[in-house]
Amino acid sequence: MTTQAEKPSVEAVEMIAVVIDGFEVSVPKGTLVIRAAEKLGIQIPRFCDHPLLEPVGACRQCLVDIEINGRKFPKPQASCTIPVEPGMIVNTQLTSDVADKAQKGIMEFLLVNHPLDCPVCDKGGECPLQNQAMANGNAESRFTGYKRTFEKPINISSQVLLDRERCVLCARCTRFADQIAGDRFITLNERGALQQVGIYEEQPFESYFSGNTVQICPVGALTGATYRFRARPFDLVSTPSACEHCASGCDMRTDVRRGKTLRRLAGEDPTVNDEWNCDKGRWAFKYQTAQDRITTPLVRNAAGELVPASWPEALEAAAAGLTAGRAAVLVGGRATVEDAYGYSKFARVTLGTNDIDFRSRVSSDEERAFLASNVIGNQTSYRDIDNADQVVLVSFEPEEESPIVFLRLNKAFRKRALKVHAIASKLSIGNEKLKANFICVAPGNEVSGLSGLTLTEKSVILVGERAAETPGLLTAVSGIAARSKAKLAWIPRRAGERGAIEAGAIGNLLPGGRPVSDAAARVDISAAWGVHGLPEARGLSTNEIYAAAANGEIKALLVGGVDPLDGSNTSIALDALQKSFVVSLEMRPSAVTDRANVVLPVAAVAEKSGTFLNWEGRGRSFDIAIPDSIQRSDLRILSVLADQIGRKIGISTVAQAAAELNSIGTWDGNKSEFGGVNAAPAPTLSGEQALLTSWRRLLDNGSLQDGEANLAGTARKTVAVISPKRASAIGVTDGDLVKISNEKGALVLPVLIEAIHDDAVWAPRNSAGSELLRTLGVASNSVVTVVKA
């Protein structure tokens, strides 16, 4: 017999009644007057006020007439800074001549130096200043002098432009940078009439979140270089969308004109991204219109050349090649849930194999077992981060690998001093902002960093995909979470990886987290799919598939959205692609299409509908933003290819795939056991040897960032990081060049001396001049030589 758990006590909220324009409303104590008015549907004009920023009362546009218990304030007050009080009576511009006159006066004052260039301003048509000047301002200006002018525009970064004469000094941008992003690169300079938004000398606005300042600017003072002078809001067709770049799960909006994406904006979802997004999600969409976009099927002819072909010709060639021998499926980590489910079903039903893996990166068998036992059904969420007593980061850099997670951590740190522990070899910029407890360990020895932590049921462990590179680390993380009852979440970099697990796009799991090895699970899926049986053997991993293809055991590969150069066995991967019959589903030329026998063009995110599951397992559905696109989704192509082969998968639309996957549901039987792996012994270093550690930066050489030069302009500088002790030993100072090498290759980078383990050297994994996997063949925990160049 079990007893019901005691419900946590809910603290009573003190309510205060206030009268606004003759209407009474009760709101929680501490509510600002401007928010109380909104409860009644009364709109008080404002510019500086923003519900997610601390009140500042900078613009004075929200002045109202207030009295408390019969005593009137001597002057109108800023409703965005004053909380409600018992006995308060508020009269807004709707019922008070005093408030109306004050607001008109402020509006007239703000427009004295404003250029009134609405016809050419990007904000025209969606501008709060324009709207409120019409609604709350005077019909004509009394000003007859010369307006103040500035050089325009000035670049405060490569992607954000500032027109200073339009600025109303609301301080939204500076407050966002400081309070939300933790990037104090932008400030209000000078005083009085000379005050203006600016950056520090020789320090551009290099923030991963700078685009949010453009979106929340209430005038056209801040504009994005990509969208400037491109369209009016009423020219655009807006569609709710989701971000394809990481697993944060941001709500987004895509704006299209004449079949072309012109801008993307952060949507509003308080449970995930509030109303923010990162610059990569906002501006990295031009890959969709790249000049080298594949738009027609290609088939390799007898001369070895890829030539355009019709869809029937390409499908016939693909079907023949995939059925000529043993085949396997590789699908990248950016597929939608529906597309991943299509690959999963195609592998089992059409090809009769469990040889499928979505992990087109450095991975391990330990990780595969961990995903099956710890991720399926895991319900750790952003709310758990908000309520955590401490958060532990293991092989995970939130600012670089899941930016909205970083913003939520920063929010909790600012509001209640959340304690963050970072187990790593190098102290990152993001963790410095969070004032994290830096547990410095040698690369590959992260397990030791867990031993000194005292965790509780309210603690949260966030482990990144790079934990797969350290043997025994996922085992240790799983163990400490089980013993302490702390919440555990796995946060990959790519948007589609959590959904791929749920869809069964991995060799040890069927859809819904059903173990391939479980007979009941196979019967379950066989019945759902209407087939007489499914393959029983556990499928091969990505590395095993490449190895089997390279030695001839696997004859054909179906590859969707995979870059073989993202893994650690690049030479074997390329050899496998060269020797196999390859069918590639891809948008642009790649190392796969260069070796493919058949290339089938697929739709970009804006050209199809679907769903991404974020790291929480939360579905983020999106509609087609460019409905006239002729490109087909992966799912649609897989469906017609299965028809061509003669073993149909029976799902050709997103709605069909989603309905079928939802009807299957999550497995409620026994999960796969996670036996665990022991940690590897630490290597012995000598002389100039060091252990390499790295991660991918948010803005790097990723192909989905291609075509957006302005975004690349704010990428962090490529440097090698070593400790003061190592710098002294090899005789270098900041800015000197160092050479990092191993038996495969070498790279030369400027050095930065800062907080890092003495045995370690850090370099970005995939940035300009530092493509570690391609140059050195390794990314982390490997011995390299570091010398002065």
Please provide the spans of the model-predicted regions:
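Structural motif
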Residues: 328, 390-392, 460, 556, ...
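Long hydrophobic segments that form regular secondary structure
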Residues: 258-275, 280-289, 297-299, 310, ...
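Short, well-ordered alpha-helix to beta-strand connector turns
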Residues: 388-389, 434-435, 456-457, 554, ...
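A cross-kingdom feature strongest in bacterial/archaeal respiratory oxidoreductases
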Residues: 2, 44, 344, 399-414, ...
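Structural alpha-beta junctions
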Residues: 348-356, 413-419, 478-490, 578-581
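N-terminal single-stranded DNA-binding subdomain of primase/primase-helicase replication proteins
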Residues: 59-82
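Active-site phosphate/pyrophosphate-binding segments
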Residues: 374, 428-549, 648, 665
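N-terminal export/assembly segments and adjacent metallocofactor-ligating motifs
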Residues: 2-38, 46-50, 66-73, 87-452, ...
